[in-house]
Swiss-Prot record:
Residues 391-426 are annotated as: Disordered. Coiled coil: none annotated. Residues 7-296 form the RHD domain. The lineage of its organism: Eukaryota, Metazoa, Chordata, Craniata, Vertebrata. Proto-oncogene that may play a role in differentiation and lymphopoiesis. NF-kappa-B is a pleiotropic transcription factor which is present in almost all cell types and is involved in many biological processed such as inflammation, immunity, differentiation, cell growth, tumorigenesis and apoptosis. NF-kappa-B is a homo- or heterodimeric complex formed by the Rel-like domain-containing proteins RELA/p65, RELB, NFKB1/p105, NFKB1/p50, REL and NFKB2/p52. InterPro entries: Ig-like_fold (IPR013783), Ig_E-set (IPR014756), IPT_dom (IPR002909), IPT_NFkappaB (IPR033926), NFkB/Dor (IPR000451), p53-like_TF_DNA-bd_sf (IPR008967), RHD-n_c-Rel (IPR042845), RHD_CS (IPR030492). It is found in: Nucleus. One of its GO terms (molecular function) is DNA-binding transcription factor activity, RNA polymerase II-specific. Homodimer; component of the NF-kappa-B c-Rel-c-Rel complex. Component of the NF-KAPPA-B p65-c-Rel complex. Pfam families: RHD_dimer, RHD_DNA_bind. GO terms for cellular component: cytoplasm; nucleus. It comes from Gallus gallus. This is Proto-oncogene c-Rel. Its main location: nucleus. A motif (Nuclear localization signal) lies at residues 289-294.
Amino acid sequence: MAGISEPYIEIFEQPRQRGMRFRYKCEGRSAGSIPGEHSTDNNKTFPSIQILNYFGKVKIRTTLVTKNEPYKPHPHDLVGKDCRDGYYEAEFGPERRVLSFQNLGIQCVKKKDLKESISLRISKKINPFNVPEEQLHNIDEYDLNVVRLCFQAFLPDEHGNYTLALPPLISNPIYDNRAPNTAELRICRVNKNCGSVKGGDEIFILCDKVQKDDIEVRFVLDNWEAKGSFSQADVHRQVAIVFRTPPFLRDITEPITVKMQLRRPSDQEVSEPMDFRYLPDEKDPYGNKAKRQRSTLAWQKLIQDCGSAVTERPKAAPIPTVNPEGKLIKKEPNMFSPTLMLPGLGTLTSSSQMYPPCSQMPHQPAQLGPGKQDTLPSCWQQLFSSSPSASSLLSMHPHNSFTAEVPQPGAQGSSSLPAFHDNPLNWPDEKDSSFYRNFGSTNGMGAAMVSAADMQSASSNSIVHATHQASATAASIVNMETNDMNCTSLNFEKYTQVLNVSNHRQQLHQAPAACPPVAAPGSTPFSSQPNLADTAVYNSFLDQEVISDSRLSTNPLQNHQNSLTLTDNQFYDTDGVHTDELYQSFQLDTNILQSYNH
């Protein structure tokens, strides 16, 4: 009839090409169902067809044929519902427009059974494309890992017999997932999905079975394509590949994502792609720049913290004053640079606040009882018998060899000096002791001067006789209170009994005898008293550039007041800041020295 189209078969949904495994009959299990092309785990579909330009009953036959032309009947069998002798056949009514095949499975045969299977197809006249029988027996031409579905439709004739055959239609090839050369390519897992833009990163891929001579790793982005580098030895048991990434086509400043997939060159089959990120070239692979930045930030924060602490630091406390009992109130905190600093004390207006006047007592040669006899120690006898200079006192007697024993004050009119310390003289530590042992002048210039340990070695019990209470005691010759070498305080409180000064630029003059000492029997008198105030020793204290001539008193002794009185007994020096205050702390009573000459 003119204008009426002939009926034909159309595939509504193709079978899935990969992912299905062909089963052997001896496995004793179902071969499964061939899924449709769009089948998912949640929505399973199956291969389906429809017959266009026809409405009525139809008989459908589905067989397996080879992949390549001529399409010969395949030795594998279709198994499932409505299947017999290796093929599927069923009748459908006009109510079904789309015909779906849900229970079709593929069952493979052994190589030794290929001839028998082909003979069965010929006997059942299963040859949709009428391939000559001679070609059908050529067993070596069959590919056992791939098949196609062939759909045939038969329409009923006027007698109701299905004799009118429509042209057969074949599906896409279906590959056995068990065969590596036809299996579905799938990346199961990778150890890393990013790498350097320069390439060369080692990547491990776990995959389904592949053939080591028919596989490659491809990187794709738009029109750019590159392949990973590996050899056949890098394919482990067909399920793992170790390769190195190719470099990207250009340098990048930000990460860029490309597609990575497996591809089989023989059939150009590819796997599902996965993302791979190329990272910019790292100029500092070990993170040294970041570490330096962190260190810089840490230092800046530390400096800021220290700066705030310095600005908030309280001012230095005033120099501790000496109370009438002669004890220091408070130590000066160490907050200065490591240079010798000797700030001055100016709290006492006159030396009378520190020392009571030493009045001259008449000589009373009283008999000493046998129970109270003070003699010079053996060390002093040895010292003054040879008349050594004051600078040799330290080497003969260490600074801790004597104790400052303070005699109790006598009757009214006694000139004994008040005791400043009740305990033996102790240096704060060995550092301060060594400093005063080696310190020779106020500014590091001038002649060598007597050390503090020499002055400390004098004992009040050995100098002053028991009957002469007017003799000055040396309970505390030098006091030091320091936290560090930065701030040092010297106290020449009771060293005045061994000094007789008339002029700080001239040699010491020996004072006339006024109060001769009375020694007990067996004691050694002071035969050479000027040795206690050696000229070189005293000049070393006074002959310095830091002493201001205009501030030091050089007036001669008048009205028999043979004493040189300065306003304070402590001095400090901070690199010339208080040099005009230096050595204003000596109170010298020549009557004491005169008493030793008698």
